[in-house]
Amino acid sequence: MWAKADSYAVFKYGINWFEAQDYCESLNEKEFAGYDDWRLCSTEEAKSMFSFTKSSVDKDGSEIHIDEVFEPDGGHNTWTYVEKPDYHQYAEKFSYITGNEFWEHKDNEYSHVRLVRDASEREEYEPEWRKDTKKFQR
């Protein structure tokens, strides 16, 4: 189950990977749409939304290839929870313009997040770095 809008709809600017995690936590604390298990998606989940046969527009008016059921005028990419092995300063992002995944430094602020949740029960996940850090405040 995907959130209908992405982080750009809320903030009106790009966010880094840590802010994406904080955004997710804040929605879970508020029980957004009645659920408290929202999370960043995997790369495969991000790919599952992409199709060249689908068309919508991002915040800049560029064509993105996701279903029109999702709110238009959002970001053109999404952070995933996938961290680069042996180089944890990078996380994987997925582009809804090109359909490509790529590594991006976690501090990059020209990014967005589309949150997802499982329809069934799942094991609680908390990234290792989160256990000893505070929430990022802008």
At which residue positions do the language-model features occur?
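Extracellular adhesion/carbohydrate-recognition regions
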Residues: M1-W38, H112-V116, E123-R138
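Solvent-exposed, polar surface segments
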Residues: V82-Q137
